[in-house]
């Protein structure tokens, strides 16, 4: 099989960035390349289309990596997606469709079936692409998880993938992390580690050269390059609550407060707002932070009922009502839209034991959770502008007689609600919404163009600072023969 595993010394070492940049660099060379991550844990997901034409759910990061690879996103690129819920259990998405729920205690029992499905997905993907760039998860040297690993070196063993390890030098201790990562692996797994990539280096790379030479001498493995720290690199986040590509707000900018729900999901919905020069977008978690907000966004959540209870416990419900009474706009997206309605019912226990609660009553709609998840890519118009988005939800909305239709959602005065994620990424739609809600003139900012420019920038950095020719050759030829063993090896 032709492919490469990008592992990391730790979480957030830069695996996603390196994988994404490699996908763009190889695609620009005319290589038919696909991204892959056996298992992702994130509440930031995206809808794509499965082979039967139905909607399917994958991690947002793998969707962006597919864009970087200029490939069509599909479930095989992220066969297992874990979405943390409200009760220390995770909802499992397998090949784009709901599979069940697991807790840490019963995870071991279901892992074998998921591993088989994930590896079959890789094999099928590899049969259709010249190169598959696989991203690992966390670190490959988590000793307590080694036995059931199918995401890192478990995948590399299955597919015979050479592996490069990424380390974040900005944190410090990267040389110890590189050496220790290899030294804690079994001889079989050490043989798969071809070398290293240094990430987020600041300063003169010549000063780093002696350390890199020593690392190569001590490990018998090469360093494939050093990526510099760059302020303009942003990717759709998997877990960290941050605004991708956020720019400094101009003087007099309108303040947008995004309520920081404990189980917030798909918060990438507000990334496009963060690019607008006339907006200052912040996350808010207490009533006082809404006092000076011009627009409040109530985002999606993995646990609508539980997060609504949290919102009330913090007094944010009263703050929202004061905001609306002052004539200022609120936008609810998916779970946030459901909270704005009159009632939320859960007769099938989709979210837990609570059968139903009253909503905030700011929109004349009711929500009932059904047992089947809706996954689709709708399109329509909003304020005369073309609108597209994606839906990931169990809630079915019933509208009252006095509510104007808004996409598939509702509007009452300055309170807006929609079940569509991603709608604000449309430039014309976003401009018209901001004009309607805040009186903000169109800025001319293009979110899709900004994302594409960042993917090109990441590809440029990979081309300039990594040995892409050597990495491509490695992916095509397989693990390097004759690599030395570093004691002590796996315990």
From Swiss-Prot:
Coiled coil: none annotated. The active site is at residues 334, 421. Keywords: Cobalamin biosynthesis, Glutamine amidotransferase. GO terms for biological process: cobalamin biosynthetic process. InterPro entries: Class_I_gatase-like, CobQ/CobB/MinD/ParA_Nub-bd_dom, CobQ_GATase1, CobQ_N, CobQ_synth, GATase_3, P-loop_NTPase. Residues 253-429 form the GATase cobBQ-type domain. The keyword Signal does not apply. The keyword Hydrolase does not apply. SUPFAM superfamilies: Class I glutamine amidotransferase-like (SSF52317), P-loop containing nucleoside triphosphate hydrolases (SSF52540). Pathway: Cofactor biosynthesis; adenosylcobalamin biosynthesis. GO terms for molecular function: ABC-type vitamin B12 transporter activity; catalytic activity. PANTHER family: COBYRIC ACID SYNTHASE, DETHIOBIOTIN SYNTHETASE. Catalyzes amidations at positions B, D, E, and G on adenosylcobyrinic A,C-diamide. NH(2) groups are provided by glutamine, and one molecule of ATP is hydrogenolyzed for each amidation. Belongs to the CobB/CobQ family. CobQ subfamily. This is Cobyric acid synthase. It comes from Mycolicibacterium gilvum (strain PYR-GCK) (Mycobacterium gilvum (strain PYR-GCK)). The gene is cobQ.
